[in-house]
């Protein structure tokens, strides 16, 4: 079931802040990953299980998009519905919700992030190969090539987001994901194209934009229901809220862990932005905030620029037998 991180119809979730404001936009189906645009929740027409979310503040407009038929996932040069929120536990205690292969720490968002976390914690799952795979899937789609081979990285199920940014200022270009755990090979393949082509805040991506793109993959872990809506840490936790709007309808919305820190928001500003993103239009009072059901989570995140993708592809091109030519508009020495 699709869901935008701001959650509306079929509870789509969106996790990025609305564009042009420090507050929220309307909430709906897809999920964005950056703070620039609004995330409206709507239903996305791309097939596949999972709750679709916008991961960076705002709502991505509703309405089903034209479906994309994707062939089975295949790798790029290496490496391998609605959202049900449980009621908060008794105050003062967070309940850890089971997530597949949950990791203990979130990863840095830069492309140079190490693939292991702090000493003593488990090795991170997210990797540059996952971003490379997303680039390869998008490239093959835009140029009409057969989809690449199955990647070599793990195919364990995770809730995930794929985020695209563009240009030197890294403006948000698309961000959609799901809170439903999906096998990574099919999930990344699906949400690569959904976020690039079906984010209703933006027109579909074109070939000309490829050289300026940055791709981020976020794997969501460590979901915990908490009693206090302030019981989460800015820059560490992503948050997903469930609330009843002024019309008596249940709504959901989410921000990925990096959003509040990037926007310079404190807890209250983040919650209020998320309520607006989720479509709450009445005045926000402290009493209303206390009625929110909040789930906090962490993420592992990896970002890769197009230039880094090309370097990776060039290195692995022959040994991995990629069945389509390298991008024609960048020169190799």
Swiss-Prot record:
UniProt entry keywords in alphabetical sequence: Nucleus, Phosphoprotein
Stored InterPro entries: AMMECR1, AMMECR1_dom_sf, AMMECR1_domain, AMMECR1_N
Boundaries of every AMMECR1 domain copy: 119-313
Positions of the UniProt region annotated as Disordered: 1-39, 101-120
GO CC terms: nucleus
Listed Low complexity bias regions: 27-37, 101-119
PROSITE patterns per the UniProt record, alphabetical: AMMECR1 (PS51112)
Gene3D superfamilies in UniProt: Hypothetical protein ph0010, domain 1
Cellular compartments annotated: Nucleus
SUPFAM superfamilies the UniProt entry points to: AMMECR1-like
Primary residence: nucleus
Post-translational modification Phosphoserine, affected residues: 16
Disulfide-linked positions: none
Transmembrane in keyword set: no
Name assigned to this protein: Nuclear protein AMMECR1
Biological source species: Pongo abelii (Sumatran orangutan)
